[in-house]
């Protein structure tokens, strides 16, 4: 059976995910035009102020980790989630209020809040697993509805796919349609304990690949250094799309004293009774 306590390795991996998310978002708020003017007057200035706040919120816990166990920790990460949600809502408005735009950002909004409640001891492993599964499932379903073209296939999806795979637009649409349905299936199966160990690696690998594609797709296409740097930070804040499924895997597998080097050992592992 899974132990109820959440150990340091889990907190560390979740903390890394939050840090990547907040830093990536913070830099993009400062360097890119995120179209805040759709919602706010003086939107660009408001956006840059939010970027500065996000970077400060990311740095504070690094300077003084004891902040996380105090009421200030709640303020730090709830504020980070709120600022990120503002950006998500701006994207939602810019996308014509398509529901998948909100849903696909579940990890971005939910992970900072989840992290602080883990640090405060408000969650046990079982609750944490369920919350992480909800966030991963919603994120992949949001991406999937875009990929299958339920309303539209975003132009950036097509550009990323054609540039990364060196295929034409028609082939990219077909590829995205297939992958979209695979995403939906896996987003449902993640809640079935007996099946989860077999599909979690798809979510891990695909989460990392889609993040890396934000940079890789433009390695040979962009002549603008500033644009390419922005794409690097687009990748950085999306790395939790792979890290959070990896965290689910590391919590639910046996043995519980997980180390990365154990992946490469050939010893057979008996599945936890949770999966029986």
Residues covered by each model-derived region:
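Conformational-control "hinges and anchors"
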Residues: 187
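Cytosolic, membrane-interface loops and tails of multi-pass inner-membrane proteins
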Residues: 37-39, 156-166
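Extended, low-polarity transmembrane helix blocks
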Residues: 1-152, 170, 174-178, 192-276
């Amino acid at each position: 059976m899974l132990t109820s306590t959440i150990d340091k390795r889990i907190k560390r991996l979740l903390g890394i995910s939050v840090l990547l998310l907040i830093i990536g978002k913070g830099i993009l708020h400062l360097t890119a035009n995120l179209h805040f003017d759709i919602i706010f007057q003086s939107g660009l200035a408001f956006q840059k102020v939010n970027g500065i706040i996000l970077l400060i919120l990311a740095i504070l816990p690094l300077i003084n980790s004891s902040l996380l166990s105090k009421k200030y920790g709640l303020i730090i990460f709830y504020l980070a989630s709120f600022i990120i949600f503002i950006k998500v809502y701006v994207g939602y408005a810019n996308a014509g209020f398509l529901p998948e735009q909100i849903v696909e950002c579940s990890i971005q909004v939910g992970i900072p809040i989840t992290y602080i409640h883990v640090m405060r001891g408000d969650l046990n492993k079982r609750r944490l697993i369920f919350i992480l599964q909800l966030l991963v499932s919603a994120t992949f379903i949001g991406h999937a509805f875009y990929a299958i073209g339920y309303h539209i296939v975003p132009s950036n999806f097509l550009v990323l796919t054609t540039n990364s795979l060196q295929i034409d637009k028609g082939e990219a649409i077909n590829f995205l349609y297939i992958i979209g349905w695979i995403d939906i299936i896996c987003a449902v199966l993640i809640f079935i304990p007996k099946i989860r160990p077999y599909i979690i690696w798809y979510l891990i690998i695909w989460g990392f690949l889609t993040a890396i594609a934000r940079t890789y797709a433009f390695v040979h296409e962009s002549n603008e250094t500033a644009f390419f740097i922005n794409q690097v930070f687009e990748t950085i804040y999306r790395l939790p799309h792979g890290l959070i499924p990896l965290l689910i895997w590391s919590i639910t597998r046996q043995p519980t004293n997980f180390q990365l080097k154990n992946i490469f050992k050939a010893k057979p592992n008996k599945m936890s009774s949770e999966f029986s």
